Amino acid sequence: MNAGQLPPELQRVHMVGIGGSGMSGIARILLDRGGLVSGSDAKESRVVHALRARGALIRIGHDASLLDLLPGGATAVITIRTAIPKTNPELVEARRRGIPVLLRSAVLARLMDGCTTLMVAGTHGKTTTTSMLVVALQHCGCDPSFVVGGELAVVGTNAHHGLGACFVAEADESDGSLLEYTPNVAVVTNIDSDHLDFYGSVDAYIRVFDSFVERFALGGALVVCNDDPGAAALARRTAELGIRVLRYGSDDRIGETLAARLLSWEQQGTGAVAHIQLAGQPNSRVMRLPVPGRHMALNALGALLAAIEIGASTDEVLDGLAGFRGVRRRFELVGTSGVGQASNSLVRVFDDYAHHPTEISATLAAFRIMLEQSGGGRCIVVFQPHLYSRTKALSREFGRALSAADEVFIVGVNGAREQPLAGVSGASVAKHVSVPVRYIPDYSAVVIEVAAAAGPGDVIVTMGIGDVGLLGPEIVAALRVRANCNTPGCSGVLQ
């Protein structure tokens, strides 16, 4: 099959859970390639509306009859292993009719056939690194196809069918999906402990990355962050297999050479400037990023090496990274409001996807530097734990990470695919937080309390997977109401 063509079974599909970040990206590629797409989802959303506008037939709720939304019915049904139960009526009906039920990851692998495939794997930073790579390649004129787990600010979408020879995507390890792929180049950002509800042990989780590397296309290359112990260990094991390894980071290890070295890094507000050294080049280079955080600089190095590996110009990649405007729900500014008459009374409200202790620590470190550079203010976090199993296993670690904030509000757990566990709630995390903390499961109440707690110069961050991100605009609105009511003569709205 040539790149850009759809196999017969993917020309008329029904997607269960079409509004999810991964599923919606697949839907966009199928539609762009001329396929007919129907789907179902649990609720209306901005993503669902956008897919309808592109021609998808979508219904809210789940019913066996939805397999007949398309003329002639669906020739395949696409789903996600961990998100949709086998008892879903559409899946039950598909099996009854003998319609193939395909996993999202298998469909993505089919869509990448015939392309030079670049993938990003790792516990943290996949979406941002993948997005950086996409933006860099677009700046180089490559027009890659891509599917990303978040919406790129610069293009306003999470997927695109490009005219170039490259396909860029995330390799999701949460349910072993990354073993569907045979990349030409893969970046591994880090290997932490996660998704133990699926793997059962840390060792099993680590081993899936080794299995991923063993599936590389002939002549494939691994780009790996040498600063992360888990990723560095994978690099050593991979090199022993005879697979080419390109390391990046700032951490020297005996007998290992860095292909890209982070010499220095300085955060400047919500951006950063780094000095880097590429192996074989006599002079260091400046890498400018419009996003903060040392972890973001490391992600950019991984994207840089992957792009160079397929022939992109270093100068053009660096220029492209300088224009990277971030990903939706990653350090995203939601809005601002004044809470007084003083010039420094501005309160900024951000939204961030961080949902693991390691991610929370890195994100809050960037916010702390930003606050110090802007003259002070507190960091107030509204956190939503994700999954009961993860909350139970990592409640202490969550508490320690969140304690880097000045004040914390915790809402109810986003259980997603899981049933509640007895004794596990946001309070399980709250008891391990060492700064002022309140567990308030009611969203309306938490909006009021957070708006009342904010002071001049503060930053408020809604954080986590799930619908906690919807609270940001409500908090901004509540701050503006507070400013209008409590400060005579002041509009309370600073743009």
Curated annotation (Swiss-Prot):
Swiss-Prot/TrEMBL catalytic activity: UDP-N-acetyl-alpha-D-muramate + L-alanine + ATP = UDP-N-acetyl-alpha-D-muramoyl-L-alanine + ADP + phosphate + H(+)
Binding residues annotated for ATP, in chain numbering: 122-128
GO biological process terms, semicolon-separated: cell division; cell wall organization; peptidoglycan biosynthetic process; regulation of cell shape
Pathway: Cell wall biogenesis; peptidoglycan biosynthesis
Listed GO CC annotations: cytoplasm
Principal localisation: cytoplasm
Cysteines joined through disulfide linkages: none
EC id: 6.3.2.8
Stored NCBIfam families: murC
Family named by the database record: Belongs to the MurCDEF family.
Its biological purpose: Cell wall formation.
The name this protein goes by in its record: UDP-N-acetylmuramate--L-alanine ligase
Naturally occurring in which organism (per UniProt): Mycobacterium leprae (strain TN)
